[in-house]
A protein has these predicted regions:
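Beta-rich carbohydrate-recognition and catalytic domains
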Residues: 1-124, 128-179, 188-228, 241-242, ...
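Secretory/extracellular carbohydrate-interaction modules
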Residues: 325-396
């Protein structure tokens, strides 16, 4: 069982969701980072799972970048991209299969037209059937030709037969960022269409836009992200009843840019790498049409064995019972240490606080001196949830990340259910679940 799948001696990159014959069969881009072992084939690979916990992996023997997979009749179609340098150019490719295992690459190659779209930014095709137009539409991560570097857009091509494509004006062109709107994805839920894409120049995360028509306008909601920063290249898929979003959580393993202070034991201030661990959420629609992510049901239910927890007071006043801890720190910091958590677990609890409380929360990877650690703070007075590390207080771990503001109700109880997995080698992050090393928690 793996909460956040990662292939052995490799990393998981962009995921191409697909559901077929009662199973989730997402494809993904595999990068071995130079590993030369027996399982060292890079490129497209296919996973098979029924619960997003147990995975079987199969190589697709296709080398190229992100795309999409669809089934028409008894034939599977794969659209992907390839790359050339000197000069830099990118191309859309096409392959077909009858069993998802043996793929035949087609002869046709689709380059950018060089009139509307930049040949150097032309990748990540997403193909779907437009019922209203009675044509196949292809969305492409690209950039329009122009005078500035802020040319990122989602391009559009149309076809009658999935082989001959005509260029159209951009599907979505905000002209707000450099690079491209990577890994575009489109789906409909209720009365709304949703366009999902990622951008590494703007917050390095997955964004979405919403519209009641495929012709737009595409609206950016107040909170236009799915998950948080560094949840990247996420695309969606459905089993016919629920919609899921598949993205990757990056590592910080490669010797690239680093801003870590000297002699620090963490990699918190290193640059994000390309690829890491798979993270799957379920997507739900709010009454106003906006989206939110929640834990996938099988993943959330995977850890149900309860165990008692011992409490060790450290600072402040503490009253402990078998089922509750009351902590009081009127003029300073108070804390207790709980048991060392298992390598794979879910922490679930209920926190009650009084009006006037400035800050409270939990911490992971702390020692008895509270010198190291990662702190999830809830600050009612600032309407903020914040995730920081011990370096702010003179400790040895570097600052991590900050979450978005949140709404509060003083009369409400706060429930928190983070999931902890040390089998994941990815960066410690906070979302509905997170992955980290074995730790004591506060």
């Amino acid at each position: 069982m793996e909460l956040f799948y990662r292939p052995g001696e490799a990393v998981l990159g962009d995921v191409i969701p697909f559901y077929d014959a009662g199973e989730f069969k997402p494809f993904y881009l595999k990068n071995t980072r130079g590993h030369a072992g027996p399982d060292c084939e890079e490129g497209w690979h296919r996973l098979s799972t029924k619960d997003h916990l147990h995975f079987t992996e199969f190589p697709a023997h296709i080398r190229g970048g992100t795309g999409s997979v669809l089934k028409v009749g008894e034939l599977y179609h794969m659209f992907y991209c390839t790359f050339e340098d000197n000069p830099r150019r990118q191309f859309i490719r096409h392959a077909t299969s009858r069993d998802l295992e043996r793929w035949e690459t087609a002869d046709e190659v689709l380059p950018a037209d060089g009139k509307i779209y930049d040949p150097a930014e032309w990748r990540d095709p997403f193909v779907f059937w437009n019922e209203g137009e009675q044509k196949w539409w292809m969305l492409i991560a690209t950039a329009v030709l122009g005078k500035t570097e802020r040319r990122a857009c989602v391009g559009l091509c149309v076809s009658d037969d999935l082989r001959r494509w005509a260029y159209r004006e951009p599907f979505y062109a905000p002209m707000a960022a450099a690079g491209a709107c990577e890994c575009p994805d489109l789906f409909r839920m209720g009365e709304w269409y949703y366009l999902v894409f990622s951008n590494y120049c703007d917050r390095f995360q997955t964004l979405y836009r919403m519209s009641r028509s495929l012709r737009g306008p595409w609206l950016a909601p107040e909170r236009d992200t799915l998950d948080s920063r560094a949840y990247y290249a996420a695309k969606t898929g459905t089993d016919g009843s629920r919609r899921y979003i598949y993205g990757w959580n990056p590592t910080k393993e490669l010797p690239k840019k680093t801003f870590n202070p000297g002699n620090r034991i963490s990699r918190d201030c290193c640059s994000w790498d390309w690829g890491g661990n798979l993270v799957v959420h379920e997507l739900l629609q709010n009454p106003d049409g906006t989206l939110r992510v929640v834990p996938e049901a099988h993943v959330d239910a995977a850890l149900q064995t309860r165990r008692p927890v011992d409490v060790t007071p450290v600072l402040g006043g503490c009253e402990a019972s078998p089922h509750a801890v009351r902590l009081r720190a009127d003029c300073g910091f108070g804390g207790v240490l709980l048991d060392r958590v298992p390598a794979l677990c879910k922490l679930e609890g209920e926190v009650r606080f009084k009006p006037g409380t400035r800050r409270f929360g939990i911490a992971l990877q702390v020692d008895e001196q509270y010198d190291t650690g990662y702190y999830l703070y809830l600050e009612p007075g600032r309407n903020r949830l914040e995730y920081v590390s011990g370096i702010r207080f003179g400790g040895r771990t570097a600052r991590a990340a900050r979450c978005s503001p949140m709404r509060w109700s003083w009369s409400a109880r706060l429930r928190w259910r983070p999931t902890v997995s040390t089998r994941s080698r990815s960066l410690c992050r906070i979302r509905c679940w997170w992955s980290t090393s074995a730790a004591r928690s506060r």
